[in-house]
UniProtKB/Swiss-Prot annotation:
Keywords noted in UniProt: ATP-binding, Kinase, Magnesium, Metal-binding, Nucleotide-binding, Plasmid, Transferase, Zinc
Name the UniProt record assigns to this protein: Pyridoxine/pyridoxal/pyridoxamine kinase
EC number(s) reported in the record: 2.7.1.35
Family listed: Belongs to the pyridoxine kinase family. PdxK subfamily.
Binding-site residues for Mg(2+), renumbered to this chain: Y136, E162
Signal peptide: none
Length: 288
């Protein structure tokens, strides 16, 4: 009715700016449910590749779903390449992964993409756990992420707990966080933004994040909002990625992402919601 059908071989594909590889839920705001609207609000074409599919996050009384079958997961990635959708790719954003097998498949695919498109930025949020929950990923994930995924990243956005486990070092003070972060930097891994950093140094109403490169370290403080929805790290890494792709310097991008998360947390508190409330205009929160 609206056009001729066919294989589309002669037509141009949708060129993706970002491939976001994360969790997906039917109900709630975590993983790609957060990353997709945040990145798209900045005018980016995004391919959302699910790693797990859950009804909701595990802190509810009921939970259904699980990790995607490995042949499905690998197929999603390889078919993006097969469709020609990656010719203008700018970034790969990685979040929650379902098991070590997914880490291995994803790492091989990223290597293939980088061989063809070496300028693509790889930003990894190495989701492992947090101080209040402990490790909440599958057995073997810490080792798989450390050995296979981290070496491919240009930048990392761990929380304080994850930094400690990945580096094998204490990360209680600012100095310890900087040392632990730099132990993971390489010629390829250029920077790290550590969220919920150095908790032993927080005031009653503030928290810290640290921006660490080989030659510099900056501390940013932000308000401590008395709510704890899931998905704040996913929101932070998506906003950070969007700002970096706009050409914003790392420290400014991290500040903008931090402000954005604080805005979301304030909205969540006002709504008295268990779920993270996304800002109504995801592009406006930027520290002047």
């Amino acid at each position: 009715m609206f056009g001729e059908t066919g294989t589309g071989d002669a037509l141009r594909p949708i060129f993706m700016d970002v491939v976001s590889v994360q969790s997906q839920v039917v109900y709630g705001h975590v993983g790609n449910n957060v990353a997709l609207p945040t990145l798209r609000a900045h005018g980016l074409n995004v391919a959302a590749v699910p790693t797990v599919m859950f009804s909701n996050t595990p802190h509810y009384p009921t939970l259904h779903g699980g990790a995607l079958p490995i042949d499905w997961f690998g197929g999603y990635l390889s078919d993006l390449s097969a469709r020609g959708a990656l010719q203008r790719l700018k970034a790969i954003l990685v979040g929650y992964l379902g098991n070590p097998e997914q880490v291995a498949v994803l790492s091989r695919w990223i290597n293939q993409v980088l061989a063809e498109h070496p300028d693509v930025q790889v930003i990894v949020d190495p989701v492992i756990g947090d101080h209040d929950t402990g490790i909440y990923v599958a057995d073997g994930m810490v080792e798989a992420v450390r050995e296979l995924l981290l070496p491919l990243a240009h930048g990392l956005t761990p929380n304080d707990f994850e930094l400690g486990h990945l580096s094998g070092r204490s990360a209680d003070s600012v100095e310890q966080v900087v040392a632990a972060a730099r132990s993971l930097l390489t010629d390829r891994v250029q920077w790290m933004v550590v969220t919920s950093a150095a908790p032993g140094t927080w005031g009653h109403d503030d928290m810290k994040l640290l921006i660490v490169t080989r030659d510099d370290a900056q501390v940013l403080s932000h308000p401590r909002i008395p709510v704890s929805p899931k998905g704040t790290g996913d929101l932070f890494s998506a906003k950070l990625t969007a700002r970096l792709l706009e050409g914003m310097p790392l420290a400014e991008a991290a500040a903008s992402a931090s402000d954005h998360v604080v805005t979301a947390l304030e909205a969540t508190r006002r709504a008295q919601s268990l779920e993270l409330q996304l800002p109504s205009n995801p592009c406006i929160t930027h520290r002047e």
